[in-house]
Amino acid sequence: MRHDYRMSEVEVAGGTAPVLRGRFLYNEPMSRHVSWRAGGSARRLYVPADLEDLVWLVRSVPADEAIHMVGLGSNLLVRDGGVAGVVILLHGVLTKLALESRTHGLPPAPPARDTAVVYAQAGVASPKLARFAATHGLVGGEFLAGIPGTVGGAIAMNAGCYGSETWDTLVQLHTLDRQGQLNERLPEEYVTGYRHAALKRPHEEWFIGGWFRLERGDGAASRERIRSLLKTRIASQPLNLPNAGSVFRNPPGDFAARLIEACGLKGHRIGDAQVSTKHANFIVNVGKATATDIERLIEHVEDSVEARTNVRLMREVRIIGERQ
């Protein structure tokens, strides 16, 4: 069902909301907003002006219409048939990043540890959070420099690399639910694991920020570690071509890239989608790949690895929208 919004006012339960101050883009190519640089269009894409504007937009969307929150689109594929509902772009909007001065309402710091809390909104790029922490003499967040997405996405999937995960240092979550209610939640309210985070009591809501507790330490050493991690990433990953990072989760006790390479799939290509010759757990767009090319290649890798090794790889990337 199609719903048209008037920019002058938004009808919500209880009356008329303030004027929406953001921008609607109609039939917006999502290839402009995902790191694969491929895929279909969003029927409606909204760029909110700020958090308050986002809240009112969510309250205005009919209950039967899907909402998709997107940051940098670094682990997202939108099928060529496009995506219905409303896509909301958070990167460049929810950008607050600051040392937290308040103590009320936050879990107490562990005894005998000198720590500080950083608040980062969902639209902040993960590498920016890593650099901010290091600049303020805080350690433990360096690995975030290796995550090519936003804080919101990192929290949602418990992103990690180099032996650390996003939820290792989270002490409180800032969320927005489908009713447009802002909440502050504790990590104990979630089930988390490898590339997974979900409320114990399922409820449709999105992460709009998080509070990270980090230890005070040697900021210069932290900045050097970030530089070292980035050098490793540049040397081992195909960053010169459009990609979405790791396509598959590592199975227990093994590596997805090793299994894919062992099956002779490095360099395998469907259309302009190719299994990277540099890192087998990356699929790159070597020209004008379509979302269909990429999805077919993902499925081919899954089927081939399972046939050869009896291991079914689990996807780390998210695919939304309609097939063409």
Curated annotation (Swiss-Prot):
Domain FAD-binding PCMH-type: start-end pairs: 38-231
Active-site residues annotated for this sequence: 195, 246 (proton donor), 316
Function: Cell wall formation.
Naturally occurring in which organism (per UniProt): Thiobacillus denitrificans (strain ATCC 25259 / T1)
Record field: catalytic activity: UDP-N-acetyl-alpha-D-muramate + NADP(+) = UDP-N-acetyl-3-O-(1-carboxyvinyl)-alpha-D-glucosamine + NADPH + H(+)
Subcellular location: Cytoplasm
Family: Belongs to the MurB family.
GO BP field: cell division; cell wall organization; peptidoglycan biosynthetic process; regulation of cell shape
PROSITE patterns: FAD_PCMH
Pathway this chain belongs to: Cell wall biogenesis; peptidoglycan biosynthesis
Pfam families recorded: FAD_binding_4 (PF01565), MurB_C (PF02873)
Descriptive protein name: UDP-N-acetylenolpyruvoylglucosamine reductase
Alphabetized InterPro entries for the sequence: FAD-bd_PCMH, FAD-bd_PCMH-like_sf, FAD-bd_PCMH_sub1, FAD-bd_PCMH_sub2, MurB, MurB_C, MurB_C_sf, Oxid_FAD_bind_N
Keywords: Cell cycle, Cell division, Cell shape, Cell wall biogenesis/degradation, Cytoplasm, FAD, Flavoprotein, NADP, Oxidoreductase, Peptidoglycan synthesis
EC number from the UniProt entry: 1.3.1.98
Cofactor(s) listed: FAD
One MF term in the entry's GO annotations: UDP-N-acetylmuramate dehydrogenase activity
Cellular component terms per the entry's GO annotation: cytosol
